[in-house]
Each structure stands twice: as C-alpha cells, then as structure tokens.
Amino acid sequence: MNHTMRPFLFIAMACAVAWAASARAQVPQSGPSFHEAVGMAWAIDPVRIELQVGHHSARARVSAAGSWFAGGPTLSGEYMDDHMLGSNEGYTTYQGGVSVPLWLPGQGSATQQVASAEAASLDEQLNVEHMALSIRVLDAAAASLIARTRVDVAHTLYDAMARMAASATHAVHGGELASTDGQMAQAAMENAHNELALAQEEAENAAASLEALLGRPVVPDLARYGEGDVTHARFIAPRDMEDNDPRIKVAHRNVEAAEANMKLARRSFMPNPEIGVDAIHEKQYGSPWDDRVGLNFSIPLPSEVRNTPIMSEARNRLASATSQETQARRMVHLEMMRVRERLIAATTVRQATRTAADSMERRAAAQEHAWRVGEAGLDTVIAARQAAGGTRMASARADVEWHVASIRMLIATGIVP
C-alpha cells in the first residue's frame, strides 16, 4: 500500500508545481484604468456605429427640412395634334410646365422642429449606450477578477492538501498513521485539484468574454477606485442624479419629438398646394406659331379621410412617449436606490468577510500544527483548510464587489471614472 502511494504522490506534487507555474504566468500586469477600458470597448462597439450613422442621418434631415419648398419640383408636358386621329388641319400644340409644392402656414418650421428633436434624441441614445456599455465592461471585469481570485484560492487549497497528503503518506509509510487517513488526504487533494481545474475553466471563459468587449486581452484595474472616488457622489441629491441619467433624458427627448410631431400634424391640415409656370407652343390652321406663358396652381382641399389617421398616429406617439418617460423615471429611481443600498451592504460585507477570512486562516494553520503534533484529527484539519479557503474566496469576492459598487455609484452620477 505504501509503495503504491509513493509514485502517486510524486505525480501529484509535479502537477502542483505545474499548476503553480501556470498560475504565476497568468498573473496580470497592472491593467488599464476603468475609463481606458470603457474607451477601448466604445471604440469597437457596433451599437455606437449604428447610432452615429442614425445621428448623421437625423442632422441631414434637419438641414433638408430648411428647404424653401415642401418637396421637389414636378415637371409636366403635353403634345397634341390632329394628324393621325383628328381633322388633319395642321393643329399642333406643345405644352410644358414646372411646379413646386408650398409649405402650409407653420409647416416648415414644425418639420424642422421634429427633425431637430429626433436628432437630439439620438444624441441622448448615444449616451445611454455608453452608460450601458460601461456597466457591461464593469460586470465583465468583475467576473474576470473574481474568477482569477478563485484560481488563486483553489491553488492555495491544492498546495495545502498536497502538503498534507505528502505528510500523511510519509506517516502511513512509517506506521504512524492509518491507511484510511492517507486515503482521506489523497481524496482531499484530488477534490482540490478538481476545484482548481474548474476555476481555471471559469477564468478562461471570463477572460474571453472581457476580451470580446475590449478587443484586447487585458483586465482593468478596479482596485484603484474606492471610498475617495464616491465621496462627492453622496452629496448629490437623488432627484438631480435621476434628472442627469441619460435614460430619462432620452425619454424626455422622445416626448419633445412627439410633441413636435403633434404640432406638425396640426399644421398639415391639408395636402400641400402647388404653384408653377406653364408654357405653350402651338400652330393653328392658317396661322403662324403662337407662344404663351402662364401660371398654374393646384390646391387639394382638406379631408377627414386623410387627416384623421395622421392626427391619431400623432396622438398615439405622444401618449406612448409620455408613458415611457414616466416608466423610465420610476425604473431609474428604483435603480438609484438599489445602487446606494448595494454600496452600503458591500461595505459592511467587505469588512466582515475580511475579518472572518483572517480568523479562519489562523484557525486552519493552528489545526494543521495540532495535527502534525498528534493533537487533532486529519478530518478536522481538512475541514478547517476548506473552510479557510471558502472564507478567503468570500472575502476576495466581497472586495471586488465593493469596488464594483463604488464604480457603479459613480456611473449613476454620470461619471465614468
């Protein structure tokens, strides 16, 4: 039994050395700041490109709405003679004209107001996307840091289990320990090895997700943000924070655009009239060619069949925009409360878990020492080491979540630190 365990122990220790080298190789350098990371993600964000194209299009509509006429010119032409089907007396007429649609009273300025309001809404949508992207980067960075911490904790536990397994194997070989205790130590080491493999997988997945956002294999340094960065945020009134939120701003811009559209619908109470110039060139029987020039106009009359759907659509748009603004204010208000409470809770949890982690680590060290001098059982030591690893992981997670809550508080105030 002792001879079969010795080669297995050597293999396990070799694996531990290999895992240690891998972990050291993966220790990140000092990463970019969170602000720089958001800039990396913003530079390659496809939604940003889409919104910017829409923004340029909206500005083009604003410029086009300043035209003198409500549309492009219309060309018309006619040709008539009596050669084929008529009396064949030599009558020939050429007639052509050009006309343009005119704005109704106030319709041109109302059209410009609608285009300007929609362009302003797209500006705020860019800010909303930037805020949403900042939160996605923050969550991905936190997940990556927590995953790396899990690797460190799992590696520390594996080293401790491997060390205890080596001691147990030596004791079993010397007849100082029962073989069942040696098997228990080997099983604990294998469990720690399995946890390390799972932690490595989680870290790789989290790093891949973050790299997809940033375009680079880097992890932003969140630890530099903390108490000092959110001091001024505590003195900002919740109402001011809500009004400064881009989601409320874009909802308000949409209401303004809907109101401008309602005004435009009222101004468009009839189809646009047209005015133009006509020219006639004709030849009559026994007479020389005759040329004439005149004006033409066309005035379609108002109709409920046309106007009712236009007004109904404008009213529906305004009602929907107003409802969405109210819902956005409620959602942002609740989120602000959650962000504040989360920061308070994260601060408390961070302090508590840090103290617990220190205490459990000292307890595990004391239990291992007691086991080596024969004053404690192996199962007690293994349980103490596992508990110490769990509290250390909880402490590290709480520390990352505290930094995340601090940054999230800054984002809520409109600042990307």
Regions found by a protein language model. Give the residues of each.
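Acidic, low-complexity, intrinsically disordered peripheral segments
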Residues: 3-6, 10, 24-27, 394-417
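Bacterial Sec-pathway N-terminal export signals of envelope proteins
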Residues: 23-76, 101-103, 110, 141, ...
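Periplasmic alpha-helical coiled-coil/stalk elements that build and connect Gram-negative outer-membrane
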Residues: 2-3, 129-244, 339-346, 366, ...
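Bacterial N-terminal signal peptides
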Residues: 10-18
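Outer-membrane beta-barrel domain signature
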Residues: 86, 92-93, 183, 194-197, ...
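Small/polar-residue-enriched beta-strand and adjacent coil segments characteristic
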Residues: 30-34, 71-129, 249-256, 261, ...
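Amphipathic alpha-helical coiled-coil segments
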Residues: 38, 48-65, 129, 133-158, ...
